[in-house]
From Swiss-Prot:
It comes from Myxococcus xanthus (strain DK1622). This is ATP-dependent Clp protease proteolytic subunit 1. It is an enzyme of class 3 (hydrolase). Fourteen ClpP subunits assemble into 2 heptameric rings which stack back to back to give a disk-like structure with a central cavity, resembling the structure of eukaryotic proteasomes. The active site is at residues 100, 125. GO terms for cellular component: cytoplasm; endopeptidase Clp complex. PANTHER family: ATP-DEPENDENT CLP PROTEASE PROTEOLYTIC SUBUNIT. Pfam families: CLP_protease (PF00574). HAMAP family: ClpP. It catalyses: Hydrolysis of proteins to small peptides in the presence of ATP and magnesium. alpha-casein is the usual test substrate. In the absence of ATP, only oligopeptides shorter than five residues are hydrolyzed (such as succinyl-Leu-Tyr-|-NHMec, and Leu-Tyr-Leu-|-Tyr-Trp, in which cleavage of the -Tyr-|-Leu- and -Tyr-|-Trp bonds also occurs).
Length: 206
Protein backbone atom coordinates (compact mmCIF):
# COMPACT_ATOMS: atom_id res chain seq x y z
CA UNK A 1 0.00 0.00 0.00
CA UNK A 2 1.53 3.37 -1.01
CA UNK A 3 2.50 5.78 1.74
CA UNK A 4 0.06 8.65 2.09
CA UNK A 5 1.71 11.79 3.48
CA UNK A 6 -0.19 13.52 6.30
CA UNK A 7 -1.25 17.06 5.34
CA UNK A 8 -0.27 19.96 7.59
CA UNK A 9 -2.30 23.08 8.38
CA UNK A 10 -0.65 26.45 8.99
CA UNK A 11 -2.32 28.81 11.46
CA UNK A 12 -1.46 32.36 12.41
CA UNK A 13 -1.12 32.99 16.15
CA UNK A 14 0.04 35.98 18.19
CA UNK A 15 3.42 34.25 18.28
CA UNK A 16 3.56 33.79 14.55
CA UNK A 17 2.83 30.78 12.38
CA UNK A 18 2.14 27.36 13.85
CA UNK A 19 1.75 24.12 11.93
CA UNK A 20 -0.40 21.14 12.86
CA UNK A 21 -0.80 17.80 11.18
CA UNK A 22 -4.41 17.55 10.01
CA UNK A 23 -5.43 15.09 12.75
CA UNK A 24 -4.06 17.29 15.52
CA UNK A 25 -5.90 20.25 14.03
CA UNK A 26 -9.15 18.29 13.97
CA UNK A 27 -8.55 17.23 17.58
CA UNK A 28 -8.56 20.91 18.57
CA UNK A 29 -12.18 20.97 17.43
CA UNK A 30 -12.94 17.73 19.30
CA UNK A 31 -12.99 15.67 16.10
CA UNK A 32 -11.50 12.17 16.21
CA UNK A 33 -10.99 10.27 12.95
CA UNK A 34 -11.10 6.48 12.71
CA UNK A 35 -10.14 5.89 9.09
CA UNK A 36 -8.35 2.55 9.11
CA UNK A 37 -8.72 -1.07 10.08
CA UNK A 38 -9.00 -1.40 13.86
CA UNK A 39 -6.04 -2.95 15.67
CA UNK A 40 -4.48 -2.45 19.10
CA UNK A 41 -2.31 0.48 17.97
CA UNK A 42 -5.24 2.30 16.39
CA UNK A 43 -7.43 1.60 19.43
CA UNK A 44 -4.81 2.97 21.81
CA UNK A 45 -4.63 6.23 19.86
CA UNK A 46 -8.43 6.60 19.73
CA UNK A 47 -8.77 5.79 23.45
CA UNK A 48 -6.06 8.33 24.31
CA UNK A 49 -7.80 11.03 22.27
CA UNK A 50 -11.16 10.35 23.92
CA UNK A 51 -9.63 10.52 27.39
CA UNK A 52 -7.75 13.71 26.52
CA UNK A 53 -10.86 15.43 25.22
CA UNK A 54 -12.79 14.41 28.33
CA UNK A 55 -10.09 15.96 30.51
CA UNK A 56 -10.29 19.17 28.44
CA UNK A 57 -14.06 19.53 28.79
CA UNK A 58 -16.18 16.69 30.23
CA UNK A 59 -19.45 18.30 29.14
CA UNK A 60 -18.72 19.05 25.49
CA UNK A 61 -19.46 16.60 22.67
CA UNK A 62 -16.78 14.55 20.96
CA UNK A 63 -17.29 13.86 17.24
CA UNK A 64 -16.00 10.45 16.11
CA UNK A 65 -15.85 10.10 12.33
CA UNK A 66 -15.75 6.48 11.14
CA UNK A 67 -14.55 5.12 7.79
CA UNK A 68 -13.41 1.65 8.74
CA UNK A 69 -13.73 -1.95 7.48
CA UNK A 70 -13.59 -3.19 11.08
CA UNK A 71 -10.82 -5.30 12.55
CA UNK A 72 -9.89 -6.72 15.93
CA UNK A 73 -12.87 -7.33 18.21
CA UNK A 74 -10.89 -6.78 21.41
CA UNK A 75 -9.35 -3.56 20.09
CA UNK A 76 -12.77 -2.37 18.99
CA UNK A 77 -14.27 -3.16 22.38
CA UNK A 78 -11.54 -1.08 24.02
CA UNK A 79 -12.80 1.91 22.02
CA UNK A 80 -16.43 0.99 22.71
CA UNK A 81 -15.92 0.77 26.47
CA UNK A 82 -14.07 4.09 26.51
CA UNK A 83 -16.91 5.75 24.57
CA UNK A 84 -19.31 4.57 27.27
CA UNK A 85 -16.87 5.45 30.08
CA UNK A 86 -16.13 9.09 29.27
CA UNK A 87 -18.58 11.71 30.52
CA UNK A 88 -18.68 13.54 27.19
CA UNK A 89 -21.41 12.54 24.75
CA UNK A 90 -19.69 10.87 21.78
CA UNK A 91 -21.37 11.63 18.47
CA UNK A 92 -20.59 9.13 15.70
CA UNK A 93 -20.60 9.93 11.99
CA UNK A 94 -20.10 7.32 9.24
CA UNK A 95 -18.28 8.56 6.15
CA UNK A 96 -17.66 5.90 3.51
CA UNK A 97 -18.20 2.70 5.43
CA UNK A 98 -18.61 1.33 8.92
CA UNK A 99 -18.28 -2.44 8.74
CA UNK A 100 -18.00 -5.13 11.39
CA UNK A 101 -16.49 -3.50 14.53
CA UNK A 102 -16.75 -0.16 12.73
CA UNK A 103 -20.54 -0.61 12.68
CA UNK A 104 -20.58 -1.50 16.38
CA UNK A 105 -18.74 1.74 17.17
CA UNK A 106 -21.11 3.70 14.95
CA UNK A 107 -24.21 2.43 16.75
CA UNK A 108 -22.53 2.97 20.14
CA UNK A 109 -22.64 6.75 19.81
CA UNK A 110 -24.77 8.92 22.06
CA UNK A 111 -28.48 8.41 21.44
CA UNK A 112 -29.77 10.98 18.99
CA UNK A 113 -26.23 11.80 17.84
CA UNK A 114 -25.43 8.90 15.50
CA UNK A 115 -25.18 9.93 11.87
CA UNK A 116 -24.20 8.72 8.42
CA UNK A 117 -23.57 10.62 5.21
CA UNK A 118 -25.96 9.71 2.36
CA UNK A 119 -23.64 7.34 0.46
CA UNK A 120 -22.38 5.48 3.52
CA UNK A 121 -22.34 1.69 3.69
CA UNK A 122 -22.84 -0.15 6.97
CA UNK A 123 -22.27 -3.88 7.49
CA UNK A 124 -22.80 -6.15 10.50
CA UNK A 125 -21.78 -9.79 10.81
CA UNK A 126 -20.50 -12.34 13.29
CA UNK A 127 -16.83 -12.39 14.39
CA UNK A 128 -14.41 -14.10 12.04
CA UNK A 129 -11.77 -16.51 13.25
CA UNK A 130 -9.45 -19.15 11.88
CA UNK A 131 -7.96 -21.66 14.28
CA UNK A 132 -5.23 -24.25 13.90
CA UNK A 133 -3.63 -26.55 16.44
CA UNK A 134 -4.58 -29.36 18.74
CA UNK A 135 -8.22 -30.35 19.14
CA UNK A 136 -8.37 -28.93 22.67
CA UNK A 137 -6.96 -25.58 21.53
CA UNK A 138 -9.46 -25.44 18.67
CA UNK A 139 -12.30 -26.13 21.10
CA UNK A 140 -11.13 -23.33 23.42
CA UNK A 141 -10.88 -20.84 20.57
CA UNK A 142 -14.25 -21.87 19.17
CA UNK A 143 -15.89 -21.24 22.55
CA UNK A 144 -14.23 -17.82 22.71
CA UNK A 145 -15.49 -16.90 19.23
CA UNK A 146 -19.02 -17.90 20.25
CA UNK A 147 -18.69 -15.82 23.43
CA UNK A 148 -17.60 -12.77 21.44
CA UNK A 149 -20.41 -13.35 18.94
CA UNK A 150 -22.95 -13.32 21.77
CA UNK A 151 -21.34 -10.20 23.27
CA UNK A 152 -21.48 -8.25 20.00
CA UNK A 153 -25.06 -9.34 19.34
CA UNK A 154 -26.03 -8.10 22.81
CA UNK A 155 -24.47 -4.71 22.05
CA UNK A 156 -26.34 -4.44 18.75
CA UNK A 157 -29.61 -5.30 20.51
CA UNK A 158 -28.89 -2.77 23.27
CA UNK A 159 -28.19 0.16 20.97
CA UNK A 160 -30.66 -0.55 18.13
CA UNK A 161 -33.69 -1.92 19.96
CA UNK A 162 -33.88 -4.89 17.59
CA UNK A 163 -34.78 -8.32 18.95
CA UNK A 164 -32.00 -10.80 19.67
CA UNK A 165 -33.64 -13.21 17.22
CA UNK A 166 -33.41 -10.74 14.36
CA UNK A 167 -29.85 -9.69 15.19
CA UNK A 168 -28.68 -13.32 15.38
CA UNK A 169 -30.29 -13.99 11.99
CA UNK A 170 -28.91 -10.85 10.35
CA UNK A 171 -25.35 -11.27 11.65
CA UNK A 172 -25.14 -14.92 10.61
CA UNK A 173 -23.76 -13.65 7.28
CA UNK A 174 -22.55 -10.26 6.04
CA UNK A 175 -25.54 -7.91 6.27
CA UNK A 176 -25.10 -4.72 4.25
CA UNK A 177 -27.17 -1.57 4.64
CA UNK A 178 -27.27 1.86 3.11
CA UNK A 179 -27.80 4.95 5.24
CA UNK A 180 -31.60 4.79 5.06
CA UNK A 181 -31.65 1.10 5.99
CA UNK A 182 -29.23 1.72 8.87
CA UNK A 183 -31.55 4.44 10.17
CA UNK A 184 -34.55 2.12 9.99
CA UNK A 185 -32.54 -0.60 11.76
CA UNK A 186 -31.63 1.74 14.63
CA UNK A 187 -27.89 1.88 13.94
CA UNK A 188 -28.00 5.62 13.22
CA UNK A 189 -30.45 8.35 14.17
CA UNK A 190 -30.17 10.66 11.18
CA UNK A 191 -28.70 10.89 7.70
CA UNK A 192 -26.46 13.95 7.70
CA UNK A 193 -26.73 16.32 4.77
CA UNK A 194 -23.16 17.48 3.98
CA UNK A 195 -24.44 20.94 3.03
CA UNK A 196 -25.26 21.61 6.69
CA UNK A 197 -21.60 21.38 7.65
CA UNK A 198 -20.14 24.89 7.68
CA UNK A 199 -16.97 24.48 9.71
CA UNK A 200 -14.95 22.16 11.88
CA UNK A 201 -17.08 21.02 14.78
CA UNK A 202 -19.75 23.63 13.94
CA UNK A 203 -23.24 23.34 12.51
CA UNK A 204 -25.24 25.73 10.43
CA UNK A 205 -27.16 28.30 12.45
CA UNK A 206 -30.91 28.39 11.93
Amino acid sequence: MPFMPVPYVIEQTHRGERSYDIYSRLLKDRIVMLGTEIDDDVANVIVAQLLFLESEDPDKDINLYINSPGGSVTAGLAIYDTMQYVKCPVSTICVGQAASMGAVLLLAGAKGKRYALPSSRIMIHQPLGGVRGQATDIEIQAKEILRMKAKLNELIVKHTGQSIERVEKDTDRDYFMGASEAKAYGIIDEIQNPRKVVGLGKEEKK
